[in-house]
Structure formats: structure tokens, C-alpha cells
Amino acid sequence: MSDSKPRDVQVLPIATNTKVLRARSWSRLRFEIEYALERGTTSNSYVIEGDKTAIIDPPVESFMKIYLEALQQTVNLKKLDYVILGHFSPNRIPTFKALLELAPQITFVCSLPAAGDLRAAFPDDNLNILPMRGKETLDLGKGHVLKFLPIPSPRWPAGLCTYDVQTQILYTDKIFGAHICGDDVFDDNWESFKEDQRYYFNCLMAPHAIHVEAALEKISDLQVRLYAVGHGPLVRTSLIALTQAYADWSKAQKDREISVALLYASAYGNTATIARAIALGLTKGGVAVKSINCEFATPEEIQTNLEQVDGFLIGSPTIGGHAPTPINTALGIVLKVGDNNKLAGVFGSYGWSGEALDMIEGKLRDAGYRFGLDTLKVKFKPDDVTLKFCEEVGTDFAQTLKKAKKVRVPQQAATPVEQAVGRIVGSVCVITAKQGDVSTGMLGSWVSQATFNPPGLTVAIAKERAIESLMYPGGKFALNILSEGNHLEYMKHFRKNFAPGEDRFANFTTTEADNGCTVLADALAYVECSVDQRLECGDHWVVYATVDNGKLLKPDDVTAINHRKTGNHY
């Protein structure tokens, strides 16, 4: 998305007495991993006007000014009765303060945990708060009777869905959303951004799939014609398909053979941001993630999860030279459970010295735990490159666990089918991709021309590859085609295990393509590509891309071919 477009607010009727206010950012809003596709985002708020008026989910501070201007042109704030919260977030507090100045009569409607958060955020104010535990309703008049469904999760302990009986709209807050900005208010062209919906799920929902399943169960009895989501296009055309997809994706997470507990607490949100990036890497690596926010989890919940998983990571900030109480409690439970056959890891954000991380690592080491990663210390707020590094750390941790499991399985001889498939050959290439400051590359031989007009190709990429998260529709990459004779050095180099964040091209002479991706000076030829679409195929993604540019560098050379004897590995 272009950075040149200013932020704005779309206002549109979506049902009887109901409007959406979509605050739009065309560029990347924040550095959190869920925004990494750089499609922009929308923060959707809603207005229901019965005999009484309610707004749902006013946005964060960065949208506050333009949102309040649009809201005042939409409703008379002196007659605003309710502000309904799908979740509580500290970066919404300035918006709440501004609303209270403009409409001091408002009553906040929220879950019970959010009520406590509001009172803590406004200790000197006697706020009007109406907590919803799940059985209450709110009658706005003119048929708009609202039902409330608490949907807590480790990321959003105060989660709450709202259902309007008359319009049959379910206000889902974080569920079913996508971080994408455009002119389409509804999802009528949902096929064009379904990968954004999947990426959003992988980042935000996969680490607590069991809570997603619980939420789906709660809404299953409702007659719903529209999901009024918190981010992205409102869901109507793909409602049934997306609901089923959420169920399938959640089940797939739960059914994974290997699982990891991700225990964390966060002082300023930075350690939680790191945890989400690691969780995405773990998910890509093929393990189930059980995300546990230690500030809200009970000791029994922590212990039960620790007993069930194959490995765990503990994330902690350092506050006054120490770990916060919830982390000390969790660490005590880890040491009490005492199963040092489980793979361990430590991570966190710190401001000055990070003593908490050293303390946690030391106690785990003294207890005999093996570590699946070097303790990951991030100073202050992670940037885009750091988050990509954290994602790769998670993938490496997952692969280490999976290798440990495979050791116990005897190596099987290739079957006749695998031997036959192994005779399918492909040109040896190095695929490079770049997005912002993040750059990476991989060896690939599962490459094939796919179309004449436009010129296009397909490339198969394993799900756990670091480059995978840069290969979404709209992404750019370069395909470096290698020559017969000089390809073996590249194959040896790119087949090794790279450390997270390691420069893949440090030993080679390179230039930069017009699209910003790395070109190997010793390549036979290269083509610059734009990802058009991708298809999930078992343990790989098949990416179709159109060719934008290219150059033959060595006209007299012959393309290197990768000859194999089995189709069960590269």
C-alpha cells in the first residue's frame, strides 16, 4: 500500500439504524508481526441508533482525531448512551478520555475483566460501567436487543462479542478480521485477500486455538448474517466459508503431534510482541502452540499445560532488576513439575540489563534443562528485522523438537512411488526476497514456468522456510537461475542450517534488482517476480508469480539441474 494516501474514515450504513466507521491506514500501522504483510489496516467502529445510541469499539489513539471528527458528524454525542468494548487495550485510553470529555454521560459496556481494567485506568473517575457476564441483554429500543458473549483468550482476557437480535449482526472484535486496507467495505471480493485472513489467524489466533474453538461454539447457535469485524472488510459473502476455515485451522493446530507452551508476561507490551513473533515461527514449524499469558492464567492452568507439552519457552521483562511476580510463579511451577526432558527457551525485552532473563536461564540450567535456543534478549521495542529474527527463532525451536522426535523413528527405505517421484527434475535456483529491511533467500529446484501470457512461474516453498512469510500476494522476489558447473557451491551453502537472522549472501558477490531483491553476480540469469497467488499443498505452499523483469547474464552457459533418487526429501 502507498504511504502517500492520508488516513481517513469511511462512514457507511450497513443495516437498519446501524453504521460502520472505518478508520483507514494505508501504510503499516505498527511493527507487530501481524502487520508484516504491509497491507495497511482498518480499525472498524460501529454505531447503533435505537431509542438509545451505542458505539462499539472506538479505535486506538493513532486514529482518535479523525475518528472523533467523523463520529461527531454521524451522531449527537450529547445523546450517546453506551460505549461497548470488544476488548480492553491501554492504547485506547486516550480515546476513552476524549469521549468522556465530549460525552460525560456515557456508560461503558464490557466484560468483567475489562471493567476492572477501566477502573484501574481511571482511578479518580467514577465511571459508569455495565459489566456483561454472558446472560445479560441490553435493549437499545427499536428492536435492537443486544446479547453479549464473553470470549476470553490469553491475548485478550477481556474479549467480548456483541450480537444484535434485530439485524443479526455479530460484532466479533478481533475474530475473523484481516489487516488489509482498501475501498471495499464488505468481503465480496474475499478470494483476493483470503491469504490475509489466514495470515491474521496464524499470527493472532493459532497460539490459542482452544479458545478460538470455544468462541466458535458460543456463536454456533446464533443466526448471523454479517460479521462486523474489528479489522478489514466486513464478512458476509465468505461468512460460512471463513467460519469453517477457523474451525479447520483450529483443529489442525490442536491435532499436531508436538506442542509447545509459550509462557509470558509483559510490562509495556514488548515481550508480548516478541512472544507473538515466536509463536508464528513455531506455527510455521509445524508444532501446536499453547500461548499462556501468566498475568491471567491460574497456577493450575499453567501446570496442566506444562505437563502436556514437549517443550516450553518463558518470556519475561525485567522490572527493577527482577522478573515480575507472574513469571516467578510460572518458573516455580516449571521447576516443581521437574520434567527436564522437555526442551526449554528464554526470551524477553529489557531496558538496561535484563537480569530477569539471566535468572530464569540460570535456574533452568541448574535444574538440568536443555535449551532449544540461546536466550533471546531484545532491548526496548523490537523493530521489523528483530521480529523476523524472533519468527525464525520460533521455527528453529520447532524444528529442533521435531528432529528429536524423528530420532526415535528408524529410517525407512524409499518406496517405489517415492523413487519414481524423485526422478522429476528441476532447475537449481536461489530465490531471494526483501520486504522493508528484511532480506532472505533459499535454494529452490521445484520451479517451473507456468504461463506464457503473462509470463509466469510456480515455485514450491516448504511451510517452515524463513522466506515463506515474504511470499504472499503482492510480495516481490528474484529467481536466480544457476549454471551447470558452479551450482554445487551454492547448493552446499544454502542447504546448511542458517542461524536466525544470519546473512545468507555474506560469501557471495551480489547486486540489487530493480525490485530491491538480491541478485547473484554469478547467476546464469535472473527474473524479478511479483507473487500473484498461492495454493496450500500439504507441507508446501505453491506460489504462482508473474515475471516483471529479467536478464540473461551468461548466454553460453547451461542451466543446472538437480537430479534426485527419491521424492521424500530434497
From Swiss-Prot:
One of its GO terms (molecular function) is oxidoreductase activity, acting on the CH-NH group of donors, NAD or NADP as acceptor. Pfam families: Flavin_Reduct, Flavodoxin_1, ODP. Residues 260-402 form the Flavodoxin-like domain. Residues 421-570 are annotated as: Flavodoxin-reductase-like. Gene3D superfamilies: 3.40.50.360, Electron Transport, Fmn-binding Protein, Chain A (2.30.110.10), Ribonuclease Z/Hydroxyacylglutathione hydrolase-like (3.60.15.10). Binds 2 iron ions per subunit. Mediates electron transfer from NADH to oxygen, reducing it to water. This modular protein has 3 redox cofactors, in other organisms the same activity requires 2 or 3 proteins. In the N-terminal section; belongs to the zinc metallo-hydrolase group 3 family. In the C-terminal section; belongs to the flavodoxin reductase family. This is Putative diflavin flavoprotein A 5. It comes from Nostoc sp. (strain PCC 7120 / SAG 25.82 / UTEX 2576).
